Regions:
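Phosphate-binding glycine-rich loops and their immediate beta-loop-alpha structural context
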Residues: 129-134, 140-193
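Structural detector for short beta-strands of small beta-barrel domains
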Residues: 50-60
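A conserved segment at the C-terminal end of the G1
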Residues: 232-248
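Short, Lys/Arg- and Gly-enriched loop/turn segments at beta-strand edges
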Residues: 102-110, 149
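Canonical P-loop GTPase G-domain recognition
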Residues: 176-230
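Beta-strand/loop nucleic-acid-binding surfaces
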Residues: 72-88
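Short aromatic-glycine-enriched beta-strand elements
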Residues: 62-66
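Helix-rich effector regions associated with P-loop NTPase G domains
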Residues: 2-33, 46-50, 84-101, 111-131, ...
Length: 384
């Protein structure tokens, strides 16, 4: 069942705003939600057909809520339901909607996405799932109530970089680490894991870091990502300045909570910008994220450029600059193991969906198998 319109959106704009927007340009009313000259130009052909622009703020089965120049409306998505799960209507999408008069009103098309968050699902059908669209900042929320899982942070970072958004790691519940020295060590650990990414300790209880975070999200669209119990809903309420999202306690033993947020909602921030809150992600499977993985492990990619062989896999090859860095202590072995793990996982996902890649992997396996057999025969003196 579709939910009712939620708090955080006006049911209608002022008559002067709506009138100006509908007669001239919708940008006046929708600018707070991210509408700009680029979207205006992209939408122009649809405006000529009498359609109206709107941004998807929540998706239900077969329907979605959109904010438009008329305010918040509900529309049917039957015309934009493709077989590809990565192309379905998603929170953050910009859409062309039928004008007032239709009952129900229909979404006729989606504008091309600038950025898109996708992960692999846990199903056996090797499908991707779209989490949010047209996002500028990815706020990866990590709770300090439990031990840091650096590998999980790397997964979220790979997903964020691959989407095209700028990641930011927020260490929530910073008040639970009262020792400044201990907190700085934790920040340094995450900074080492997240090169080129700002790491910000934040406490909704004390207000630490809230002003800095508010400044980051005040422009553009931000999405909150994190595991269940990471404190995303509490953080969302802090940024929104009111208790819009329900908050539930996390288990003390592992910091995991029940899903407070069950749908992806787009909400207007009081200081400017919009926020998409997502349900806690128990599974963070990669989806065609080779570029994102490379960005997360940029120091390894840099070292790889100095390897003797261009196809070095950084295991036992002679002249490998990456393994040499591990032996010298310049590169933590955990980083290399995590890098290998994510690359293998991503390759498996790509192979399941790309016949050409499957053929290349099979060919590589056969080549390595033949080389291994030749080496064994040479060792046993069977080659004449």
């Amino acid at each position: 069942m579709p939910g009712p319109p939620f708090e955080g959106f006006p049911l209608s704009f002022s008559s002067s705003e709506a009138s100006t927007s509908l007669q001239a340009s919708p940008s006046h009313a929708l600018a707070p939600y991210g509408w700009d000259a680029g979207w205006e130009a992209e939408f122009a052909p649809h405006a000529e057909q009498g359609l109206l622009p709107g941004r998807v703020v929540r998706v239900d089965r077969g329907q979605c809520d959109l904010v438009t120049a008329d305010g918040l409306i509900r529309a049917d998505t039957a015309f934009v339901t493709p077989h590809d799960p990565l192309k379905v209507v998603c929170t953050g999408d910009w859409a062309a909607v039928e004008p007032v008069g239709g009952n129900p009103r229909y979404v006729r098309t989606l504008l091309p996405r600038r950025t898109a968050f996708a992960r692999s699902t846990s199903s056996k059908r090797s499908e991707g799932q779209i989490l949010a669209a047209n996002v500028d900042h990815a706020i990866i929320t990590v709770s300090l109530a439990v031990e840091l899982d650096l590998g999980r942070i790397e997964r979220f970072l790979a997903l964020a970089w691959e989407s095209g958004a700028q990641p930011l790691v927020v260490l929530s519940k910073a008040d639970l680490v009262p020792d400044p020295t201990g907190l700085s060590y934790l920040v340094e650990d995450v900074e080492t894991t997240a090169p080129g990414v700002q790491v910000l300790p934040v406490s909704s209880a004390t207000g630490e870091g809230v002003d800095l975070l508010s400044a980051v999200v005040s422009g553009g669209t931000s999405v909150l990502l994190g595991a269940s119990g990471a404190g995303k809903s509490t953080l969302a309420n802090t940024l929104l300045g009111e208790d819009v999202m329900t908050v539930q306690a996390a288990r003390d033993v592992d910091g995991k909570g029940r899903h407070t947020t069950t749908t992806r909602n787009l909400l207007l921030l009081p200081g400017g910008g919009v926020l998409i809150d997502t349900p806690g992600l128990r599974g963070v499977g990669l989806w065609d994220a080779e570029t994102g993985v490379g960005q997360v492990f940029s120091e390894i990619e840099g070292l790889a450029a100095d390897c003797r062989f261009h196809d070095c896999v950084h295991e036992s090859e002679p002249g490998c600059a990456v393994t040499a860095a591990v032996e010298d202590g310049a590169l933590p072995v955990r980083r290399l193991e995590s890098y290998r793990k994510l690359l293998r996982e991503n390759q498996r996902i790509v192979a399941k969906t790309d016949a050409r890649v499957r053929a290349e992997i099979l060919k590589d396996w056969k080549r390595k198998g033949a080389a291994g057999r030749a080496a064994m025969e040479a060792k046993r003196g069977r080659i004449r």
